[in-house]
A protein has these predicted regions:
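Alpha-helical assembly-interface signal, strongest on the long, hydrophobic N-terminal helix that forms
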Residues: 1-82
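N-linked glycosylation sequons
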Residues: 71-78, 82, 91-384
Length: 384
């Protein structure tokens, strides 16, 4: 057994000797050095490409946001590209070009061409989009990322470096579906409250313009005494098709996600709820929104079929709403935070309502899809 152990130890020592010989041969031939040079220099290229991509993404989203908000300033691309560059290039990056389409106009150098191999294909005609391409730039103005070791290898004496490129594409526009709260407002009331999309109030915490004091949107008014809408009559138990109703609550959290809207016959639809009692989860959502002055996003319907839990709403678009008060009976009511009055009176009448005002803004991209009617809300998404 002792001889066996000795032989095994001797074998291990012999293996180490063999490995040492192989390493010496490879080093003598420059193979290991070449491999190390390749790893270091390729790693630099990957790092530069990642930084350029981050800069292009950030710039595309920032420009898209500025365009959605009305200013459309492509010149901000450079600051975002530089902010994502590291010491590898001296904290700088080059914006090769900015192009795109904004409604009837263009962004940057104009509509993007179709032959840029670094960028995604152009979106369909009629889409608002911007493309930002970034590339290597050093603090000294050079556009070549110099190698660390590669130039020392045989045959590479003239190699000066490489230029790395990255491209990003962002789109913006009205969302067709998205994540919303579990209430729905009518297109008629949206049209009246915003003068057909021409007048919006300031977003909280700023008070709205005096001309845009909170509107009261009735949900249930069997006496007709509180109705001040010019919208046509609607489902049983509701004042008008232009007013407010509960949606179905498939997630039991007073929310609808993009997947809760059904696309049929060229339109999106979603289910309704009787609303005989205010759902407890909606009491929490609406209470928090009113207390914290949080903007809520609501589906706006253009038409409906059926009644109560069998009602189906046809989606017109998504809107942003600042909830300032509500009255669903003595168990769930709060005075409007601007007027100080309980909306839709009370005084024993069987009337329920919400109060607030419509806003312009950006809806979170999660769960949202582009292509809807513009009701003051837009979404921005990276698409390439």
């Amino acid at each position: 057994m002792r001889n066996l152990i000795v032989r095994r130890l001797q074998g291990a020592r012999n293996d180490r000797g063999a490995i040492g010989v192989v390493v010496a041969i490879l080093m003598g031939a420059g193979v290991l050095f070449g491999m190390g040079a390749l790893v270091v220099d390729v790693g630099q290229l990957y790092q530069n490409q990642a930084e350029l991509q981050n800069g292009a993404d950030a710039a595309a989203l920032a420009i898209a946001k500025s365009c959605a908000e009305g200013s459309c300033t492509p010149s901000i691309a450079t600051s975002y590209a530089d902010a994502n560059a590291s010491g590898l290039t001296g904290g700088t990056a080059y914006v090769t070009f900015v192009c795109g389409v904004n409604g009837a106009g263009t962004v940057g150098t104009g509509a993007c061409g179709t032959g840029n191999k670094h960028c995604a294909a152009n979106p369909p005609t009629g889409t608002n989009y911007v493309e930002v391409e970034t590339s290597t730039e050093l603090a000294n103005g050079s556009h070549l990322l110099p190698p660390v070791f590669a130039r020392t290898l045989a045959g590479n004496g003239n190699y000066q470096g490489s230029t790395v490129y990255a491209c990003s594409q962002a789109e913006w526009g009205a969302p067709v579906v998205g994540n919303t709260v579990g209430i729905t407002l009518g297109y008629c009331d949206w049209t009246e409250a915003t003068s057909n999309g021409t007048t919006y109030a300031s977003a909280p915490p700023y008070p709205p313009n005096p001309a845009s004091l909170p509107v009261v949107i009735d949900f249930h008014d069997p006496t007709g005494q509180e109705t001040d809408s010019n919208c046509p009559s609607g489902p049983a138990g509701q004042t008008a098709s232009g007013n407010f109703g509960w949606t179905a609550d498939p997630n039991s959290n007073c929310t609808l996600t993009g997947s809760d809207f059904t696309y049929t016959g060229g339109v999106y639809t979603y289910g309704g709820n009787t609303g005989n009692n205010t759902p407890s989860d909606c009491q929490t959502v609406l209470g928090n929104a009113q207390t914290n002055q949080t903007v809520i996003y609501v589906p706006v319907y253009a038409a409906y079929n059926g009644q109560g839990s069998k009602a189906t709403y046809t989606l017109q678009g998504l809107a942003a709403f600042a909830l300032t008060g509500y009255n669903f009976g003595k168990q769930f009511q709060v005075a409007d935070r601007i007027t100080g009055q309980l909306p839709c009176g009370g005084n024993g009448k069987d009337v329920t309502c919400i109060s607030g005002y419509f806003l312009q803004g950006l809806i979170p991209a999660s769960g949202a899809s582009l292509g809807g009617t513009n009701l003051g809300v837009q979404v921005i998404k990276l698409t390439g």
